[in-house]
Amino acid sequence: TSPQREATCTSEVSGCPKIYNPVCGTDGITYSNECVLCSENKKRQTPVLIQKSGPC
């Protein structure tokens, strides 16, 4: 298993790309791509890390 890492935010002004490249967050939720996870983290106080690439 790879170590947990933070989601890398791209400066997508128009939102996240509609590319399905799932990542599994440390909250046990599968996000459709790293950008989506990053966007969700901006709304949280405690960021969710990427547990692994691929669905949970």
Curated annotation (Swiss-Prot):
The gene is SPINK1. It comes from the Eukaryota. Disulfide bonds join C9-C38, C16-C35, C24-C56. GO terms for cellular component: extracellular region. This is Serine protease inhibitor Kazal-type 1. The record marks K18, I19 as: Reactive bond for trypsin. Residues 3-56 form the Kazal-like domain. One of its GO terms (molecular function) is serine-type endopeptidase inhibitor activity. Its main location: secreted.
